Amino acid sequence: KELFNIDVPYREVQFFNLQKSFDLSDEQYDKLMEAGHLPENLLSYEETPGASETINKWVDEGHEVFIITGRPFNSYEPSRKWLDEHHLERVPLFCVDKYGREIFEHEYEYNMTLEQLYSMTFDFAIEDSPSAFEHVLHFNNCKVAVFDRPWNRQAEFPNDNFVRCKNWNQIDKLFEEYAGNVG
């Protein structure tokens, strides 16, 4: 709203693609993405209730947990700081060029290409972006908690491994059921 005087309530954001949700020009979208990933904005985001408690519980139980985001590579430092401030310092963070936005080669250990991501193995994932569902399909038999958001409510799930969850309690319950069945 501050940038373009466009007011779309959160519950009405129908698409993960904010350019489409807010009907922005390419130039406006670029400006929005730049502003949204400024360190001061990233550091101001509120935590989703239950997230850090649940993730830390999994780490305490001995599960290997990674946070993988499609944020731009240059947002790593403020994202890492935010995680640390929310007691997630034990969880590695990786920025993956999921959306083909990166135009420069960045040789940092915390940035990865899709090919590098696909070489990893995951049993459980949490995703809210329908455009990223295709990436999760690369992991055989990976259970996917789809965090319920306005922009994914109309999305069709690729298969039965994708389960909609309304909050972190439901995500944790799904994880515990899945971990109990495969462990």
What is the meaning of each model-derived region?
Residues 73-126, 130-137:
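Substrate-recognition "cap/lid" segment bordering the active-site pocket of phosphatases
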Residues 101-106, 153-160, 174:
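Short, charged, surface-exposed secondary-structure boundary motifs
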Residues 85-96, 121, 157-180:
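Structural recognition of alpha->loop->beta junctions
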Residues 124-166:
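Acidic, Mg2+-coordinating phosphoryl-transfer loop and its flanking beta/alpha structural elements
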